[in-house]
Design a protein with these regions (language model features):
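Hydrophobic residues in beta-strands and at strand termini
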Residues: 44-46, 93, 142
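Hot-dog-fold acyl-thioester-processing enzymes
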Residues: 20, 45-69
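Non-catalytic linker/capping segments at the edges of enzyme domains
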Residues: 1-43
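Hydrophobic beta-strand-centered segment that forms part of the acyl-chain substrate-binding groove
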Residues: 54, 72-103, 108
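HotDog/MaoC-like acyl-thioester-processing domains
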Residues: 3-9, 96-144
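Residue-level recognition of specific faces of alpha-helices
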Residues: 62-64, 83-85, 90, 114, ...
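A generic structural signal for short beta-strands and their flanking turns/coil linkers
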Residues: 26-28, 38-40, 83-89, 100, ...
């Protein structure tokens, strides 16, 4: 993974404030596990409301977790005072997301002035085992 220098010295506060103010982030129960330049990890509880059978997480919340993880990682490298908008994201489901804990990790792979691209991965864990359940790419546009 490349090493990045944040353009906003207060990037961590900006990421927390912006993401945690979003109603869907609040509803999903996302909480930050790690925020570093170009990297963000979220934890999301697995609740019956986001599953299709009471156990396995439905694809929509998995895609949202990837989008938020990659987008937040991108936001760590954005200049102060700008916003980011998702212009593209892909989701590849790899395994059923079953467990009691769900984690998303976003890692920036390219950071330009107008576009930032991040890889996003999702993992489910339960009973001491963690498996990767999805992967994707997220492209964000910097909006002044």
């Amino acid at each position: 993974m490349p090493t990045f220098t944040p353009r906003n010295p207060a990037y961590e506060e900006a990421v927390r404030r912006t993401l945690l103010a979003m109603p869907y982030v609040q509803w999903l129960g996302l909480s930050f596990q790690r925020i570093a330049p170009g990297v963000v990890e979220f934890v999301m509880p697995i609740r019956p409301e986001i599953t299709f059978d009471g156990k396995a997480v439905q694809a929509g919340p998995i895609g949202a977790l990837l989008d938020f993880s990659g987008g937040a990682a991108a936001f760590t490298l954005a200049p102060a005072g700008v916003m980011l908008a998702t212009i593209d994201f892909s989701v590849k489901l790899l395994a059923p997301a079953i467990g009691d804990r769900f984690m998303g990790r976003g890692e920036v792979i390219s950071a330009g002035r107008s576009l930032i691209v991040a890889r996003a991965d999702a993992f489910a864990s339960g009973e001491g085992e963690e498996i990767q359940v999805a992967t994707g790419l997220v492209t964000m546009r910097v909006i002044s």
